[in-house]
Amino acid sequence: MDHGFYPSNLDGEGLRIGIVQARFNEPVCAELLEACVAELEKLGVEGEDTLVVTVPGALEVPLALQKMAESGQFDALVALGAVVRGETYHFELVSNESGAGITRVGLDFNMPVANGILTVDTDEQAHARTREKGRDCARAAVEMANLVVALDSLRDQEDEEDEDDDE
């Protein structure tokens, strides 16, 4: 049996990326953003094709992502933030609800959303993960934007073939 294979495509040229950065735990979030934007540039995403908006915290990220997705101006989105465990249940609430909201935006709008909301026990853990997570999110956004385009083109080809069969 023959199988097709679509290799990962990390060419960011021409892609438009929206980034929502939470400001809570600002030093960590600034490092996440710096790493993400630097990696997007390395992948060929132009600065003018990237829009960064900030929100107060992780729970506000999904709404900003939703508004960006509704605009139709982006090929992929990135969520950046940090939730550090405290002494109350709030950590679980913020982690779970922000994650669910981020996932819902991607599925509701058929748009790649890279989740870079760190959920960690300590500030030290957060700082140790910022560079890698920021880069990973940039790469995931570009790869998934290209994959969605490729898969949509398969559907479009199938639709054209169906139209040809109807004639």
UniProtKB/Swiss-Prot annotation:
One GO biological process term: riboflavin biosynthetic process
Keyword Transferase among UniProt keywords: yes
Cellular component, GO annotation: cytosol; riboflavin synthase complex
Broad class of enzyme this protein falls into: transferase
MF (Gene Ontology): 6,7-dimethyl-8-ribityllumazine synthase activity
Active site: H90
Binding site for (2S)-2-hydroxy-3-oxobutyl phosphate: E87, T88, R129
Domain of life of the native organism: Bacteria
Residues the record lists as binding 5-amino-6-(D-ribitylamino)uracil: F24, A58, L59, E60, A82, V83, V84, N115
Pathway: Cofactor biosynthesis; riboflavin biosynthesis; riboflavin from 2-hydroxy-3-oxobutyl phosphate and 5-amino-6-(D-ribitylamino)uracil: step 1/2
Position of the signal peptide: none
Keywords: Riboflavin biosynthesis, Transferase
EC number, UniProt record: 2.5.1.78
Reactions catalysed, as given in the entry: (2S)-2-hydroxy-3-oxobutyl phosphate + 5-amino-6-(D-ribitylamino)uracil = 6,7-dimethyl-8-(1-D-ribityl)lumazine + phosphate + 2 H2O + H(+)
InterPro entries per record: LS (IPR034964), LS/RS (IPR002180), LS/RS_sf (IPR036467)
Family listed: Belongs to the DMRL synthase family.
Function: Catalyzes the formation of 6,7-dimethyl-8-ribityllumazine by condensation of 5-amino-6-(D-ribitylamino)uracil with 3,4-dihydroxy-2-butanone 4-phosphate. This is the penultimate step in the biosynthesis of riboflavin.
Name assigned to this protein: 6,7-dimethyl-8-ribityllumazine synthase
Species: Cupriavidus pinatubonensis (strain JMP 134 / LMG 1197)
